[in-house]
Amino acid sequence: MPRSLKKGPFVDKDLMKKVDAAIANNDRRVLKTWSRRSTILPEMVGLTFAVHNGKKFLPVFITENMVGHKLGEFSPTRTFYGHAGDKKTKAKK
């Protein structure tokens, strides 16, 4: 179920402080964050975040198409190595 409109989008307070400081200083450094649950706001467009995926920080450059989504959507947490194939069918081909 989506979040109520009267509540507004959720953004971690500490993350918003970092964003406001980066905008005020015209600083384009990568902002490191663990807050995957924060919603991307229009003020964040053009900034780069290093979003933690559980193991390392992945750089995410924010574009206009990402507004309204969560930061965690752009930092995958699982690695897919593919399904194990049948060795006999591979040898025949």
From Swiss-Prot:
One Pfam assignment: Ribosomal_S19
One of the GO biological process terms: translation
Highest taxon listed in the record's lineage: Bacteria
PROSITE patterns (UniProt xref): RIBOSOMAL_S19
Coiled-coil residues: none
Key words of the record: Ribonucleoprotein, Ribosomal protein, RNA-binding, rRNA-binding
Stated role: Protein S19 forms a complex with S13 that binds strongly to the 16S ribosomal RNA.
The protein, known as: Small ribosomal subunit protein uS19
Organism: Lawsonia intracellularis (strain PHE/MN1-00)
